[in-house]
Swiss-Prot record:
UniProt-recorded name of the protein: Large ribosomal subunit protein bL12
Keyword Ribonucleoprotein: yes
Known role: Forms part of the ribosomal stalk which helps the ribosome interact with GTP-bound translation factors. Is thus essential for accurate translation.
Entry keyword set: Ribonucleoprotein, Ribosomal protein
Disulphides: none
GO function terms (MF aspect): mRNA binding; structural constituent of ribosome
Subunit organization: Homodimer. Part of the ribosomal stalk of the 50S ribosomal subunit. Forms a multimeric L10(L12)X complex, where L10 forms an elongated spine to which 2 to 4 L12 dimers bind in a sequential fashion. Binds GTP-bound translation factors.
GO annotation terms (biological process): translation
Pfam families in the record: Ribosomal_L12 (PF00542), Ribosomal_L12_N (PF16320)
Length: 126
């Protein structure tokens, strides 16, 4: 197997979170941005895309922005939500910002956000 084939196999095995982290690491190392360059020729395509109906988002990601002052309560809630062990939940809370739940429905994401905020955390939904 060639180097490139091995690289493709390794990259294909990454999770979405690992791929996003890899992207950020490469941006920092190479001093570039993954944002698409804006071109004048792209303007007509953008106008056509704007005319298309906007689909409502159905899957949400709950992100723990900050563990807050009551980290023990937040760790308990994170464990209840994610079924993580004590150490993993503690690492997640102390390593904020971190993703708590991916692919959640709108209601589920709102419920998780409410639980974590009541425990003292700062939470964002994307």
């Amino acid at each position: 197997m060639s180097k490139l084939e091995k690289l493709v196999e390794d990259l294909s095995a990454l999770t979405v979170l690992e791929a996003a982290e890899l992207s950020k690491m490469l941006e920092e190392k190479w001093g570039v941005s993954a944002a698409a360059p804006v071109a004048v020729a792209a303007a007509p395509a953008a106008a056509a895309a704007a005319a298309a109906p906007v689909e409502e988002q159905t899957e949400f990601t709950v992100i723990l922005v900050d563990g807050g002052d009551k980290k023990i309560n937040v760790i308990k809630e994170v464990r209840a939500i994610t079924n993580l062990g004590l150490k993993e939940a503690k690492d997640l809370v102390e390593g904020a910002p971190k993703t708590v739940k991916e692919g959640a429905t709108k209601d589920e994401a709102a419920k998780i956000k409410k639980q974590l905020e009541e425990a003292g955390a700062k939470v964002d939904i994307k």
